[in-house]
């Protein structure tokens, strides 16, 4: 099952970093709400995650589920986003997510495809993303209110469910 959402943030604007953190809290890491609540606690999915495309304004939640869990899983997935909109997450979860993003950024500095992608983005947008200290300082400033603001701009656009024939 896939749930597709639109949000008005674009690459490089002031909502860029809060959206990255919000996605991390939602489904970007193993400690995320989708993974912890839908997969681990409720056992409704064998795989679950969310992905963010900062260039198109598209957020995707996806889950591998059994068809009989379809409605319950969809409702529970939506509830994880609603929890973020209402600020139902802890400072520990927020800090853990920011730490994971920091480590991902540091690891990307030693990855050829990440370096090529970053050079392409710099050429395309005329901006330099190489100032990691500044980027991390901005990341540290993101708080619960910033997450709630960006989460409240996320709107459901499409639901896709594919099932086989028995």
Predicted features along the sequence, with ranges:
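His/Glu-based metal-binding/catalytic segments typifying zinc-dependent metallopeptidases
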Residues: 1-33, 42
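Short acidic (Asp/Glu) and glycine-rich catalytic loops that position anionic groups and cofactors
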Residues: 1-2, 14-18, 54-59, 75-78, ...
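Short beta-strand-to-loop capping motifs
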Residues: 5-7, 63-67, 163-164
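Short amphipathic beta-strand starts and helix->beta connectors
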Residues: 41-48, 143-146
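Buried hydrophobic packing residues in well-ordered domains
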Residues: 3, 20-22, 38, 61, ...
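C-terminal regions of mature proteins
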Residues: 97-166
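M16/insulysin-pitrilysin zinc metalloprotease superfamily fold
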Residues: 49-108
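Hydrophobic alpha-helical scaffolding
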Residues: 11-12, 24, 28, 63, ...
């Amino acid at each position: 099952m896939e749930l597709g959402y639109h949000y008005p943030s674009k690459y490089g604007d002031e909502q860029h970093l809060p959206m990255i953190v919000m996605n991390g809290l939602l489904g970007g890491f193993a400690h995320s709400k989708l993974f912890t609540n839908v997969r681990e606690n409720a056992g409704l999915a064998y795989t679950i995650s969310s992905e963010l495309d900062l260039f198109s304004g598209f957020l995707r939640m996806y889950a591998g589920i059994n068809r009989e869990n379809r409605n319950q899983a969809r409702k529970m997935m939506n509830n994880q986003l609603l929890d973020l909109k209402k600020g139902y997450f802890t400072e520990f979860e927020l800090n853990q997510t920011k730490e994971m993003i920091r480590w991902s950024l540091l690891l990307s500095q030693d990855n050829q495809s990440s370096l090529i992608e970053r050079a392409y983005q710099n050429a395309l947008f005329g901006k330099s993303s190489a100032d990691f200290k500044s980027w991390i300082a901005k990341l540290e400033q993101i708080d619960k209110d910033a997450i709630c603001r960006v989460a409240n701009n996320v709107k459901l656009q499409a639901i896709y469910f594919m099932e086989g024939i028995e």
